[in-house]
């Protein structure tokens, strides 16, 4: 699969976009910048995260295979 934003990851795993962003924030992969937009942290970049190339409002994206497994592991460790 390709790179996906929170909206498409949410669709793939059956969760809302807000839920995905919340989990990514809890995982330390993204933060809100001074303008209130999502931005990657160093940890997010270290696992291959990139900002989308949108001129309107770039968003964090990850390779689905990578982020899916990390989300499953995080959920099993922290959210049960």
Regions found by a protein language model. Give the residues of each.
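Positively charged, aromatic-accented nucleic-acid-binding surfaces
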Residues: 2-14, 21-80
């Amino acid at each position: 699969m390709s790179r996906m934003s929170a909206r498409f990851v949410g669709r793939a795993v059956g969760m809302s976009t807000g839920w995905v962003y919340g989990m990514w924030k809890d995982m330390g992969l993204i933060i809100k910048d001074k303008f209130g937009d999502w931005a990657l942290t160093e940890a997010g970049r270290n696992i291959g995260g990139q900002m989308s190339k949108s001129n309107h409002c770039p968003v964090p994206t990850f390779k689905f295979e990578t982020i899916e497994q990390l989300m499953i592991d995080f959920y099993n460790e922290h959210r049960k």
